[in-house]
A protein has these predicted regions:
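C-terminal motif of bacterial Sec signal peptides marking the signal peptidase cleavage site
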Residues: 35-38
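Hydrophobic alpha-helical segments within soluble ligand-binding/sensing domains
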Residues: 105, 159-185, 231-233, 280-284, ...
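Short, solvent-exposed amphipathic alpha-helices that sit
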Residues: 73-90, 166-173, 198-217, 235, ...
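Extracytoplasmic "Venus flytrap"
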Residues: 58-80, 84-85, 93-111, 117, ...
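Hydrophobic alpha-helical
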Residues: 121-139, 207, 221, 225-286
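Flexible loop/hinge segments that line or gate small-molecule binding clefts
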Residues: 127-165, 187, 279-289, 293-294, ...
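Short beta-strand elements at the ligand-binding edges of bilobed clamshell
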Residues: 94, 151-176, 190, 222, ...
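Hinge/cleft segment of the Venus flytrap/periplasmic-binding protein
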Residues: 40, 47-59, 191-195, 199, ...
Length: 349
């Protein structure tokens, strides 16, 4: 069973979710937030946080929410977690591997299995390498994958973007921008942290479907940076220097947008390539505003947090839960940037 969040004017307004023709689930997601989160950093290069408010009263369940890196993208997801704590009377601990290492996620999960957690939601760094670990977790407690799936594992639910469709949307935005710039040939470069994560695999699949057969263009091998921002920027600098006919740059993960924008701004090239990004980092949105980035494909990280915790609680309560919760995407360009930006700033308060 798949649950989809349909597009609407505001990404953060109350939503109606359709489960199937036979059954409809109505959910109201108010944009109110629970403030007061504490954060701690371990010596092992990972950080964790939990709501200070959640300790003030007994929580029905304690859940863990594990990210795949420490990008600012996850700050919005944390707002969803704190809202879910308030709405559902649970406690949520958030874990972030600061360097995006699989070893951090493995350690988090081992600790979670021996501590008093009732369920875990995780964005898998390498789903194939972690399948056996995920299956051990799923044997002990409800397991939700968010942002990036582990479809071969025994996870209960995937909450997040349809990443193939997100890739297609990025490709469509790229084609429109190339046409507007009257660019008819050249190289295409893709930048991402790693290609063993399901969201990267699926976004590239969607991009390949739209760009792979574009006449006059050649897609280069993917540039990988292992979530190292300095390397991410250097990769762009190298590509700009190596390929004078570089026509299109696409950043597949959230931090790639700012890294690409910084490198292109500093470049001496007269003909700037078209840039397409993902997600809503502040520098990415500023670059959309000034025209350097043509479009960015944004997700709904608030819903990653909120819907993951809702799914975990429903599973613990013995309720029926859809196996996929599609949180939707939005293509942000200059013409709809201001409205999106205002909503985002309100959400971050």
């Amino acid at each position: 069973m798949r649950l989809s969040i349909p597009p609407r004017t505001s990404r953060f307004a109350p939503a109606v979710f359709c489960v199937s023709r036979a059954s409809v689930l109505w959910v109201s997601l108010l944009p109110g937030l629970l403030a007061g989160a504490g954060c701690k950093k371990s010596d092992s290069g990972a950080s964790s946080s939990s709501s200070s408010a959640s300790g003030d009263k007994a929580a029905s369940y304690r859940f863990a929410f594990v990210t795949n890196n420490s990008s600012d993208f996850w700050n919005i997801a944390e707002k969803g977690l704190r809202k879910a704590e308030k709405d559902f009377g649970v406690r949520v601990d958030m874990f972030r591997p600061l360097k995006g290492e699989i070893s951090d996620q493995q350690r988090f999960l081992e600790d979670i299995m021996v501590q008093n957690f009732d369920g875990v939601a995780i964005s898998p760094i390498n789903p194939d390498a972690m399948t056996s670990t995920f299956d051990r977790v799923a044997a002990k407690m409800p397991l939700v994958c968010h942002d990036s799936d582990a479809p071969k594992s025994k996870r209960n639910v995937y909450v997040g973007t349809n990443n193939i469709e997100a890739g297609r949307s990025a490709g469509a935005a790229a084609i429109a921008a190339l046409k507007a710039a009257n660019i008819t040939k050249g190289k295409i470069a893709l930048f991402v942290g790693r290609m063993d994560m399901q969201n990267a695999i699926e976004r590239k699949q969607g991009l390949d479907e739209t760009l792979g057969k574009l006449p006059g263009f050649e897609v280069l091998p993917v540039f990988l940076d292992k979530t190292d921002r300095a390397l991410a920027k250097k990769n762009v600098e190298d590509a700009l220097a190596r390929y004078p006919d570089l026509a299109l740059i696409i950043g597949i993960w959230s931090y790639n947008g700012p890294c690409i924008a910084g490198a292109v701004r500093a470049s001496s090239r007269k003909d700037k390539p078209v840039i397409i990004a993902f997600d809503e980092e502040e520098e990415t949105l500023k670059s959309v505003q000034d025209g350097l980035i043509s479009a960015t494909i944004v997700q709904r990280p608030f819903q990653f947090g909120y819907q993951s915790i809702k799914a975990l609680k429903d599973l613990k309560d013995g309720k029926q839960v859809p196996t996929v919760v599609d949180t939707g995407i939005l293509t942000v360009k200059k013409d709809n940037l201001e409205q999106f930006w205002n909503e985002l700033r309100e959400l971050k308060k």
